[in-house]
């Protein structure tokens, strides 16, 4: 009987060790009291870029409320424009976009906290090959 318990204990121990090895690293999301509304504009000319960026930003915890095409379609790099000074999501959004191109354009009539102008280096940001 004690041999049986020993085998059962060993089995549980091995199962516990193997399940620990298979655990994936969870991404740590920065929680904000207000996610902020974000506008995404396709400024690179790549078909479906705004939809892909919307999906990526939503997976990162941002509330994308508007997507559309920009009049200009020749941006090489992604640009982040902040409309609300002091918005707590600014740093997290810039980090998610992997950009240092951040402009502050205060607009009291803006209905979003930030606008994202997608550049041609979109794939480097969202790490997808399906574009």
Write out the residue ranges for each language-model feature.
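C-terminal motif of bacterial Sec signal peptides marking the signal peptidase cleavage site
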Residues: 16-19
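Accessory recognition modules or surfaces
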Residues: 25-36, 77, 84-87
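BRCT (BRCA1 C-terminal) domain core and associated BRCT-interaction motifs
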Residues: 64-118, 123
């Amino acid at each position: 009987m004690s041999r049986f318990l020993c085998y059962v204990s060993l089995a549980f121990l091995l199962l516990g060790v193997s399940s620990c090895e298979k655990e994936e690293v969870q991404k740590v999301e920065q929680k904000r009291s207000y996610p902020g509304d974000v506008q995404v504009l396709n400024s690179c000319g790549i078909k479906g870029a705004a939809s892909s960026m919307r999906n990526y930003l939503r997976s990162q915890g941002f509330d994308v409320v508007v997507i559309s095409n920009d009049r200009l379609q020749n941006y090489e790099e992604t640009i982040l424009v902040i409309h609300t000074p002091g918005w707590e999501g600014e740093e997290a959004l810039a980090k998610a976009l992997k950009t240092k191109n951040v402009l502050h354009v205060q607009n009291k009539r803006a209905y979003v906290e930030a606008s994202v102008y997608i550049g041609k280096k979109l794939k480097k940001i969202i790490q997808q090959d399906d574009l």
